[in-house]
């Protein structure tokens, strides 16, 4: 028999290498708050259902609260040790505090439904924070849209000047993108906000558990009715990583534009000293590290999405140890997107836009070609003929080094 909580049928102790390879405490300890919340509601339920006494339930509840406080105060390290994960770590601390009564915590529960619950609580908490940060970004873009709604600038396709637009319209385009991201996140929340607790390892429990009461107490919309699905589902992880990848893609595109605009060749944007860095060699440099880092970090978020999709694609029902690999990528995705969203809004607010140069660029060149083409169409000329005619005028204007208006007035 081993000293593991599951060691009753084993005659040998776990190999030390396997113990380290198997352990997840070094990274899943971030779930401690959600794990304790779930356990506290679970023991309340056990008392409600007369499986534990009220005195037992309250003793466990209070000890768990002490453990939460001690963890927050940094009293414990989370290096690899005998406990595999944060769930067993907390349970062993509980047993040390209150003795054999602590062994009753896991009554009617498996780590399979326990970790599924913790992940849902964790992603829900972080999803709400991401939603809040998205709202701040959208509000910032709305302010920039209003402030610059009359400021002309060149619009681009293929990174070539195309037609005049306004700087306000540019920011409104990103406001629309992040608005869709916010809608996707809120849609994800509706699907993920269901409780798996009570599903046990995969087939529920013979104990008279009240899954609906637990779900309501934890703020869920309801329970996941199929217990196999409850413990094996990681769609909510994949979907959150997918939404995060979309957000990062939009952030990366926005940052790409701002990086280009900050070059001397464009000179549309002046970086604030507080949000730029210099060179260790070249004293003339002012580098856009903030948008470059955000652009670069999109790749790691994409990678985590591909990783969890690959982990899940070949798994039979129900739980498999492969699913331990869902966490590090998820945690890094969440940390990355929160960091990027926390940085992008003040960065945008710090920028100074060279609106006079933008206007000059928008009014020079041949950005008015499409408007002239359409004026010919309104006079009855077939579109293709008008397109050909304006193209010929542009070629002539380029040769004469003048604008279209100057060419047409001269004619």
UniProtKB/Swiss-Prot annotation:
**Pathway membership, UniProt:** Amino-acid biosynthesis; L-arginine biosynthesis; L-arginine from L-ornithine and carbamoyl phosphate: step 3/3
CDD domains membership:
Argininosuccinate_lyase
Any GO CC annotation of this UniProt entry: cytosol
Key word Secreted present: no
| Family to which this protein belongs | Belongs to the lyase 1 family. Argininosuccinate lyase subfamily.
Task: Spell out the HAMAP family in the cross-references.
Answer: Arg_succ_lyase
Q: What is this protein called?
A: Argininosuccinate lyase
Please tell me the species this chain comes from: Legionella pneumophila (strain Corby)
Q: What is the lineage of its organism?
A: Bacteria, Pseudomonadati, Pseudomonadota, Gammaproteobacteria, Legionellales
